From Swiss-Prot, chains A, B:
The keyword Methyltransferase applies. Pfam families: Methyltransf_4 (PF02390). The active site is at D117. It catalyses: guanosine(46) in tRNA + S-adenosyl-L-methionine = N(7)-methylguanosine(46) in tRNA + S-adenosyl-L-homocysteine. Pathway: tRNA modification; N(7)-methylguanine-tRNA biosynthesis. Keywords: Methyltransferase, S-adenosyl-L-methionine, Transferase, tRNA processing. The gene is trmB. One of its GO terms (molecular function) is tRNA (guanine(46)-N7)-methyltransferase activity. The keyword Phosphoprotein does not apply. Belongs to the class I-like SAM-binding methyltransferase superfamily. TrmB family. This is tRNA (guanine-N(7)-)-methyltransferase. InterPro entries: SAM-dependent_MTases_sf, tRNA_(Gua-N-7)_MeTrfase_Trmb, tRNA_methyltr_TrmB_bact. Its EC number is 2.1.1.33. One of its GO terms (cellular component) is tRNA methyltransferase complex.
């Protein structure tokens, strides 16, 4: 997502109780931050924040963490919380390729990848969030039966991702080429991007993949 | 494929040296029929026969068997052989759901499914050639590292098949949503149906799946 640079975004973030200024401090101890042992679900790249905010409302027994690289993007998402302290929601500004700095081995239960950058050029394949090096990072921080839930409107990224999941021995499930016309539509929480693109007739692809320990 | 009923098709078939009139006789002994121990590749549903005839020409070190239910369809395909005896090619008229009557356990190395009937109605899902009961039959007759190669122009059948392969623990590879634009196009042998449909701009989906013994 492209946003204007927002001067002072990083300072502004610290005003929000759901923003975690010192995320490395919680590695291996996120349960302390949340004050309970509930499962932790992570969204990588939070867009405008509707998805993670909605899930946090719907599932008070799950702890949600949004990990997003750009301060301006985190700020847009965290603004939805209106300075409220939401006990099961946290926003982190960090590089997703370094998830192992944020989370101990097997500390989290699920990862959401929503409309990640497709990086269409072959020479940028390693930057795609389903490239095998990312999958191995996810496997490290996810519990043994942990899951990845991926949505995209980009067919090439979807095709690439299915092949990566298969090659890295992730167990796939609920593969759909048209989420909004599928039986999974009822429980689907749309991101802002998803709503805009699907309203133009763009189909949404989705897959769940669980890490089968090699 | 729909064809007019051809009177006397079954009798006509017996005139062709590549047609095997008594296929059950060879169960477990197809190497006797071919006179060698070369790997056996099977096409289920042979269409007009170009695919299997072309593969047999290109790969003299592989034995090919086309299994097709309808006598009229087998006849059209076998007519391409022009009454020649082709040492590594055999045509069989038989029901693919009964492959275990034709082949001993682990007797064959590869199965091709080309443009199988999509059976679009949900209540007919069990008839699709990638339904789990078929996959378990294939697993039984295929060698341990045996492969299924599937092509289709039907997106719903492809989506269904990917889910079946995943659920039945087949290891997928080379998943492509547009075969003719992919790196696999160079080695692709087009069926008659494929040529006709792709010339109209219809995309071809393809996947390889190998049976990982449970």
């Amino acid at each position: 997502m492209r946003l204007r640079n927002i001067p002072g975004a990083e300072a502004a973030l610290r005003e929000y109780p759901t923003f975690v200024d010192n995320p490395l401090f919680y590695k291996g101890n996120w349960k302390e931050r949340f004050g309970n042992n509930n499962p932790i679900h992570v969204e990588i790249g939070c867009g405008k924040g509707r998805f993670i905010n909605t899930l946090a409302e719907r599932h008070p027994d799950i702890n949600f963490i949004a990990v997003e690289l750009k301060a301006e993007v985190v700020l847009r998402a965290v603004q939805r919380t209106e300075y409220k302290a939401i006990p099961n929601l946290a926003f982190v500004q960090y590089d997703a390729s370094k998830l192992t700095e944020l989370f101990a081995d097997h500390e989290i239960s699920r990862i959401y990848l929503n409309f990640s950058d497709p990086w269409p050029k072959t020479r940028h394949a390693k930057r795609r969030l389903t490239y095998k090096s990312f999958l191995n990072t996810y496997r490290q921080v996810l519990v043994a039966d942990g899951e990845l839930h991926m949505k995209t409107d980009n067919e090439n990224l979807f095709e690439f991702s299915l092949n990566q999941f298969a090659a890295e021995r992730f167990q796939m499930r609920n593969i759909t080429f048209d989420l909004h016309q599928s039986k999974l539509a009822a429980d689907n929480v749309m991101t802002e991007y998803e709503e805009r693109f699907s309203s133009r007739g763009q189909r949404i692809y989705r897959v769940e993949a669980s890490c089968v320990i090699k």
